[in-house]
């Protein structure tokens, strides 16, 4: 054991510091014989088990958080997106053929003369006199 020159022993004022007192650790020299010897805690020790008052009992089969789906109104029946009138005409059996329909975005164009879009007064070409 190596001691520094000028060291005269003496007490240690810190509780956990290891100070030498006559060649013996002050921690072990000052501890009473009746004190329980507890091993030092490790840095990454697991937390102590929870007491029964801290344990929350959940019924089996239920998740921790349940989402509440709240609807202010019942779902309404809406027509399918797209051309509702053409699909209705097709269901009634008016003889529309699928190959005569051309769909551009939400507009359905047809080669049948009755279903061609009419040109408004601004879109008509000027009459040639």
Swiss-Prot record:
InterPro entries: DUF5538. Residues 34-57 are annotated as: Disordered. Pfam families: DUF5538. This is Putative uncharacterized protein C19orf73. The gene is C19orf73.
């Amino acid at each position: 054991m190596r001691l520094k020159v000028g060291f005269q022993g003496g007490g240690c004022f810190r509780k956990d510091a290891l100070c030498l007192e006559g060649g013996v650790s002050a921690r072990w020299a000052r501890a009473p014989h009746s004190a329980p010897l507890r091993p030092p805690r490790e840095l990454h020790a697991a937390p102590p088990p929870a007491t029964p008052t801290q344990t929350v009992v959940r019924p089996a089969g239920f998740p921790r958080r349940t989402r509440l789906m709240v609807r202010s109104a019942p779902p309404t029946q809406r027509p399918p997106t797209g051309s509702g009138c053409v699909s209705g005409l097709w269901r009634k059996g008016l003889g529309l053929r699928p190959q005569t329909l051309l769909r551009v975005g939400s507009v359905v164009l047809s080669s049948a003369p009755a279903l061609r879009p009419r040109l408004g007064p601004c879109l008509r070409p000027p009459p040639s006199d």
